[in-house]
Regions:
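Contiguous, well-folded functional domains in the mature portion of proteins
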Residues: 1-416
Length: 416
């Protein structure tokens, strides 16, 4: 697997073919809110969010929602603005960020999971996806062509193919085409470390960190009862929930997460060579919890007594995700989980059932939004992970890496 395979960019649509239906759908929100408790839960969510103005990192969000609480703006107007929002370099996730804060209040969680509201919201996100894939969504592309990223997440458009490099928009006909851009030939060469069969490569671009370094107790019951705690946070990751059926096989093993930023290459590739013995899409929520809850902060939001809401990773398994179980000769079963955050409309799989994959091979891509790839390994393996000379550490210290680069290696058993 020497070169990365390019994908065909999605054909852009004419927004005028969707706009009327999208606006009519938003008007239906009034009827959705008339169902029992929905309007009161919406108002309660606004009250809860605006009450957090004393929390330093919530003051700006509380100020944003205050006009809605005062009746100066409506939820319908919020979704109308979001519908045709094209991500900017300064605020790529503007509306989903504000929305996530609101729906992760106690009342907001009830509203977002209501039997009437939830399907309405998913349909709304699909309409927003139509906008992102339309020829009307190119207004910010010139800024993205000049964007150099941030210190934490550098970006260079020169790494990518552009339909027309001489154009200020790169020749992309929709924002979605830009988001799903292909790498230029020769970019992201595959790791050539030896012995090749013992090497794991990066499945995607992004910041990699451990969710668990692998410390399985000898007692099986103890293993099955363990949570994956994030160091320095109050968050937990429930692998059994994120990986239905196969979860117990990986409990106690090394567990890595790679978080993709908006500017990252959003295609993902096989980390190992093997046979895909199971794959499937698991539907989940279209929201997640932000990880800024601090139980030691006097002004931190109070958790309801019946809630396990402690941070965004605690809800990770509830998000839409695609799971592959790969059978290998050297690593046993390896799990790869593609998780969609930030209103990701689709996780596209390119692998057929029961097919063999080669390390570094293209396996699929994310639609627009925030995304994450989790890799899970069985506990009996002695694996070491690093990016270049930088060892992989905990979630507070993600290490930037590029797809198909050397990531991990199985170590030989010690012997005299």
């Amino acid at each position: 697997m020497s070169e990365i395979t390019s994908i065909t960019l999605p054909v852009p649509i004419d927004w005028s073919t969707k706009s009327k239906a999208a606006e009519e759908h938003i008007k239906k929100l009034k009827d959705v809110l008339k169902h029992p408790h929905n309007e009161s839960n919406y108002i309660s969510a606004l009250v809860e969010e605006c009450a957090e103005e004393l929390i330093p990192n919530r003051k700006q969000v509380a100020s944003y929602w205050e006009p809605y609480l005062m009746g100066e703006l409506t939820l319908e107007s919020f979704f109308l603005e979001w519908l045709t929002y094209t991500p900017t370099t300064l605020s790529p996730g503007k509306y989903i960020e504000y929305w996530d804060y609101l729906v992760n209040t106690q009342s907001g969680l009830i509203l977002s999971n209501d039997a009437y509201f939830k399907p309405w919201f998913k349909d709304f996100l699909n309409f927003h996806g139509d906008w992102i894939n339309s020829t009307s969504s190119t207004a910010t592309l010139a800024d993205w062509m000049k964007f150099g990223g941030t210190k934490a997440h550098p970006f260079n458009i020169e790494d990518y193919e552009r339909p027309d490099p001489t154009s200020s928009t790169g020749g992309f006909k929709s924002f979605n085409q830009f988001f799903l851009r292909n790498l230029k030939p020769g970019q992201r060469p595959i790791c050539n470390a030896e012995p090749a069969d013992d090497v794991i490569v990066a499945p995607c671009d992004g910041g990699v960190f451990y969710l668990d370094r692998g410390s399985a107790p000898g007692n099986t019951e103890e293993v099955l009862s363990r949570d994956y705690d994030l160091p320095g946070k109050s968050d937990r990751f429930d692998l059994l929930e994120a990986l239905p059926g196969y979860g117990p096989y990986f409990l106690g093993g090394q567990l890595l997460d790679i978080l993709l930023w908006f500017t990252d290459y959003h295609h993902f590739h096989a980390p190992v060579t093997g046979e895909v013995i199971h794959q499937g899409l698991y539907e989940g929520s279209y929201n997640y919890d932000f990880g800024d809850y601090n139980p030691e902060d006097f002004y931190a939001p109070k958790l309801p007594s019946d809630s396990d809401k402690v941070g965004w990773y605690d809800k990770l398994g509830k998000h839409q995700r695609y799971v592959w179980i790969i059978k290998t000769e050297r690593f046993g079963l390896v799990a790869m989980i593609a998780i969609g955050f930030w209103g990701v409309g689709s996780i596209v799989n390119a692998i057929k059932d029961k097919s063999k994959v080669e390390k570094g091979q293209y396996m699929g891509h994310f639609g627009y939004g925030g995304s994450s790839i989790v890799l899970a390994f069985k506990p009996s393996l002695d694996l070491q992970f690093k990016v270049g000379e930088k060892p992989v550490e905990g979630p507070d210290k993600p290490v930037l890496m590029e797809v198909r680069k050397c990531l991990g290696k199985r170590m030989k058993p010690f012997s005299w």
